[in-house]
């Protein structure tokens, strides 16, 4: 019975190992048998200690494997490991003798299939959208006519050729190309650096700062376009102070940079069409605006001319304005002379009955005093009447002087209106300065033709045809009566002015006889 509890005797042919020797042997076998392997599984229990190394598990429904990614390699992984993500890890198998377990040293990692990529893409899109990077309020309008366009794409391939060809056909512009890798590990950092690099260019520097950016790439699979879904690219596009057009892939391809860009183009060619207008269409629009401008200028001149003619017809003649007051003056002057005679006769009639009752000496004294008083009043009345007549004459002369230059002021107003119209046309022409030089030259010719027309309609052109302007004391004379009353005439011909004196003076009007004595 005691033999049942005794250990069997070891075979003399079975080797004996220490724990370290056996662990080392297992390590060598695993590392030699499984070199570089690719393992598919779900990530679980992710740990990131202060050392910078990355520890996590790879598992499926039946087994779990430990995985390690050293610090130097963890920063270069194309996918950031997150718990629950299904990935394909590439690395080398080894063991950890201290705990007697095997593990994989991960060198690279990628999502396992399109489904995993789409799940990760949707999760990243939701996180960035929650930060407000895709808000419509952040998007800027594209410049109407950019002088410099920056293109971020591969320097070779059909994409850049299509963009340059389309820009050349529509509106040739200055294009700066920032060459980048459009797929692979270098794609995301190079694209982000290019966007930020264009934004750091100073205004007025040796390299012109773009007014518009285009990030372009041709079509491809989800994996090929993955670089444009990276967070650094999306943030660079959202932070760009220069308006940006995303033209990545075909119309059915959508990347995260499309949401962050100010505009999304379905193709690189469509991006070029969004960037610049068609030059021929601009020229056609400019022709139409120039024609409308010419019609507007002609209509303005026609309305001003018609207004001047209407004012000239509505202005009364000088003779009709002066005729009424002059007739009233003559009437009152005649009545005044008759009233004086009647007043003297009435006083004489009152004095004659009294003379019979008065002594001669007393009567003579009374008559002398009355005569003196009457003489004083007569002289005062004559002085007053003279001053009133002089003031009335001065008022009539002033009225005549104000009305005589009326036509001259109308002519001056016409010239000022023409100058204002010319200035308006000049301002409108200056606003069109950015248009092509050929169109500007044609507009300038039209403006010069209008200016020549203005000069032709001026009175100086009329002087060249044999007419003359007659002035007296700086005022324009329009009637024979005004010319006959002037002492000196100034005649303006087309080549200068000539002063002319009258050959004989008009005989002055005789003064009325003084009031005689009553006795």
Curated annotation (Swiss-Prot):
Entry's Gene Ontology molecular function annotations: exodeoxyribonuclease VII activity; nucleic acid binding
A GO BP entry: DNA catabolic process
Coiled coil: none
Record-stated family: Belongs to the XseA family.
Protein name (database record): Exodeoxyribonuclease 7 large subunit
NCBIfam families for this protein: xseA
Function: Bidirectionally degrades single-stranded DNA into large acid-insoluble oligonucleotides, which are then degraded further into small acid-soluble oligonucleotides.
Its EC number(s): 3.1.11.6
Reaction catalysis annotation: Exonucleolytic cleavage in either 5'- to 3'- or 3'- to 5'-direction to yield nucleoside 5'-phosphates
Region (Disordered): 500-519
Top-rank EC class of the record's enzyme: hydrolase
Presence of the UniProt keyword GTP-binding in the record: no
Lineage per the UniProt record: Bacteria, Pseudomonadati, Pseudomonadota, Alphaproteobacteria, Rhodobacterales
Keywords attached to this entry: Cytoplasm, Exonuclease, Hydrolase, Nuclease
Subcellular location: Cytoplasm
HAMAP family, per database record: Exonuc_7_L
Cellular component GO terms held in the UniProt record: cytoplasm; exodeoxyribonuclease VII complex
Main subcellular location of this protein, as a coarse class: cytoplasm
PANTHER family registered for this protein in UniProt: EXODEOXYRIBONUCLEASE 7 LARGE SUBUNIT
Name of the encoding gene: xseA
Pfam families per the UniProt record, alphabetical: Exonuc_VII_L (PF02601), tRNA_anti_2 (PF13742)
Subunit and partners: Heterooligomer composed of large and small subunits.
